[in-house]
């Protein structure tokens, strides 16, 4: 785990320096990892943060002037896909019954600075909710989105969101490569 953490931090540092000139000055930083875990909350939180670092990294890799890029006219733009991750994360996290207030995500915020800020807000919201629930509450069954059946554990819904984010991440990688950009995760030795 320590090797993965170190490698992730080095990759983030290297990719950040390569795209610093492209990143808006007000863009939020990617979250740090908690470290080795001994309980469910820590594991879920580490996975959530790792997932958000990947999404944030791929969003940051695309230059601001390319955020409107669409592989085909029928597809969403890069910025719309990034914003989609933030929107779905906040929407489904709101259904988990947390006391932590949800951040407002502007559905029309598709500039690089706005989309990255939305991803950061959604990630921070997830961090707060996971910490709020803790081990016992993460395993409680709640009403779930229709496509997951009538009831699911909070943990399952959070992992669904990570899976969905990774699916969208894969799409965003194609957008980057179509623009001649190597995704941050592919820059690792």
State what each model feature region is.
Residues 61-67, 130-139, 177-183:
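Surface-exposed helix-capping loop/turn segments at secondary-structure junctions
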Residues 1-8:
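Bacterial N-terminal signal peptides that target proteins for export
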Residues 45-56, 66-105, 144-189:
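Short, contiguous alpha-helical
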Residues 58, 110-145, 151-166:
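Acidic/histidine-rich alpha-helical segments that form the ligand environment
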Residues 19-21:
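Boundary at the C-terminal end of the N-terminal hydrophobic targeting segment
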Residues 23-49:
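Short N-terminal segments immediately surrounding and downstream of signal-peptide cleavage
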Residues 30-40, 96-108:
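Acidic/histidine-rich, surface-exposed loop or edge segments in extracytoplasmic proteins
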């Amino acid at each position: 785990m320590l090797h993965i953490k170190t490698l992730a931090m080095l990759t983030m540092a290297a990719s950040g320096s390569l795209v610093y000139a492209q990143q808006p000055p007000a863009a939020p930083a990617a979250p740090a990892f908690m470290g080795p875990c001994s309980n469910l909350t820590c594991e879920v939180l580490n996975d959530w943060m790792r997932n958000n670092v990947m999404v944030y990294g791929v969003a940051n890799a695309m230059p601001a002037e390319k955020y409107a890029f669409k592989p085909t006219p029928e597809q969403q733009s890069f910025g719309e896909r990034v914003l989609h991750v933030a929107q779905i994360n906040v929407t489904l996290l709101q259904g988990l019954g947390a006391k932590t207030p949800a951040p407002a995500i502007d559905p029309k915020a598709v500039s690089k600075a706005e989309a990255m800020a939305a991803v950061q807000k959604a990630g921070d919201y997830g961090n707060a909710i996971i910490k709020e629930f803790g081990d016992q509450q993460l395993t409680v069954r709640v009403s779930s989105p229709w496509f997951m059946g009538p009831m699911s554990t909070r943990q399952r819904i959070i992992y669904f969101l990570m899976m969905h984010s990774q699916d969208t991440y894969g799409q965003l990688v194609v957008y980057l490569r179509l623009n001649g950009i190597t995704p941050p995760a592919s820059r690792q030795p």
